[in-house]
Amino acid sequence: MAKLTKRARLIREKVEATKSYDINEAVALLKELATAKFLESVDVAVNLGVDPRKSDQNVRGATVLPHGTGRDVRVAVFTQGANAEAAKEAGAELVGMDELAAQIKAGEMNFDVVIASPDAMRVVGMLGQILGPRGLMPNPKTGTVTPNVAEAVKNAKAGQVRYRNDKNGIIHTTIGKVDFEPAQLKENLEALLGALKKAKPAAAKGVFIKKVSISTTMGAGVAVDQGTLDDAK
């Protein structure tokens, strides 16, 4: 049998796999177990009561977390004219049309989010095979195809997270860094769950948010008792 690492032994000792923890206790555990040599992210997995095989039960969207994600986000915007100037003023690192598309085709991908105005989709559409697999393709549902590109840039910079359930009906995203205050992580999680509840498909029946687990980049998942979250009230 393979020998457990020191961190794995600590996780096994501290985390009860079948227990749902008070949110404050769960965050305290994550902080105690975050022993990596870099600043770990705090990630969340939300099991939804949906059938992901049915298109009318898939959940996709975006929300701005009140305390951001702790990441510096580089934004590329496809637009022109006055919108281009507005995007630059809002903080976008890359703004353009055909010349920006050429950079991407050449393999220059120095950005984390792509935003486009509707009139630019004729250019962006040709980049689907490059941006799509990386989860970067702009989409109206996530607010990344919009006539108000400046607002979208500000949202991305402010800590907007995009979410989409996977083939198992689970949402995976980040809610901050391990050095965030416990209250900040709690409020970010509550904001995400609130957004998910608003995005509940009409076709989804029964319990919608079935399980919530938080973890650090290198750590094990800790199940959260939803009753200890303000959003549950």
From Swiss-Prot:
<dbReference type="InterPro" id="IPR023674">
    <property type="entry name" value="Ribosomal_uL1-like"/>
</dbReference>
<dbReference type="InterPro" id="IPR023673">
    <property type="entry name" value="Ribosomal_uL1_CS"/>
</dbReference>
<dbReference type="InterPro" id="IPR028364">
    <property type="entry name" value="Ribosomal_uL1/biogenesis"/>
</dbReference>
<keyword id="KW-0689">Ribosomal protein</keyword>
<dbReference type="Pfam" id="PF00687">
    <property type="entry name" value="Ribosomal_L1"/>
</dbReference>
<keyword id="KW-0699">rRNA-binding</keyword>
<dbReference type="GO" id="GO:0000049">
    <property type="term" value="F:tRNA binding"/>
</dbReference>
<comment type="function">
    <text>Protein L1 is also a translational repressor protein, it controls the translation of the L11 operon by binding to its mRNA.</text>
</comment>
<dbReference type="InterPro" id="IPR016095">
    <property type="entry name" value="Ribosomal_uL1_3-a/b-sand"/>
</dbReference>
<dbReference type="InterPro" id="IPR005878">
    <property type="entry name" value="Ribosom_uL1_bac-type"/>
</dbReference>
<comment type="function">
    <text>Binds directly to 23S rRNA. The L1 stalk is quite mobile in the ribosome, and is involved in E site tRNA release.</text>
</comment>
<keyword id="KW-0694">RNA-binding</keyword>
<dbReference type="GO" id="GO:0006417">
    <property type="term" value="P:regulation of translation"/>
</dbReference>
<keyword id="KW-0820">tRNA-binding</keyword>
<dbReference type="GO" id="GO:0022625">
    <property type="term" value="C:cytosolic large ribosomal subunit"/>
</dbReference>
<keyword id="KW-0810">Translation regulation</keyword>
<comment type="similarity">
    <text>Belongs to the universal ribosomal protein uL1 family.</text>
</comment>
<comment type="subunit">
    <text>Part of the 50S ribosomal subunit.</text>
</comment>
<dbReference type="GO" id="GO:0006412">
    <property type="term" value="P:translation"/>
</dbReference>
<dbReference type="GO" id="GO:0019843">
    <property type="term" value="F:rRNA binding"/>
</dbReference>
<protein>
    <recommendedName>
        <fullName>Large ribosomal subunit protein uL1</fullName>
    </recommendedName>
</protein>
<dbReference type="InterPro" id="IPR002143">
    <property type="entry name" value="Ribosomal_uL1"/>
</dbReference>
<keyword id="KW-0678">Repressor</keyword>
<dbReference type="GO" id="GO:0003735">
    <property type="term" value="F:structural constituent of ribosome"/>
</dbReference>
<keyword id="KW-0687">Ribonucleoprotein</keyword>
